[in-house]
Amino acid sequence: MYAKRAKEIFDEEIHELEKLRDSINTTFDQVVEVLYHCQGKVVMMGIGKTGIIAHKMAASFASTGTPSIFVNAAEAVHGDLGMINGKDVAVLVSNSGSTNEILNIVDPLHRLGCTIVAMTGNLDSPLAQRADYALSIHVDEEACPLGIAPTTSTTATLLMGDALMV
């Protein structure tokens, strides 16, 4: 019974990931070029569950030799922006694209001269509109039947991060 449900969850997530894969466009190419030519470090930022994924992304980029750090978006405006400069590329991860903690750091990052890449499930969001580049991590449905735990969206974010890294 549980094994059957587990397979259904796999199938649901795979279906959403295939749709996301098919939506990848030339913006992805542009972001890869920006990351490749970054003269500073790649700064991954997020909060909550997307922050956990962004932290993993920073660690993976660092594993491949790309200078990368994670900065919690909520801490950024309380002094942690001091470790960021205009040579850095900031990757802001927010499924909704309207999280206040993320939006509050966009203007300070622009003032520092950072290139901003948004990874969001909503390309019409304030974050996507204010970023230099916006990558979709949109999924139509979460695998969580209650709709309260990010499941498919975090998997999609993790996979997009891995695709950027390798």
Name each model-derived stretch.
Residues 1-40:
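An N-terminal, well-structured beta->alpha segment
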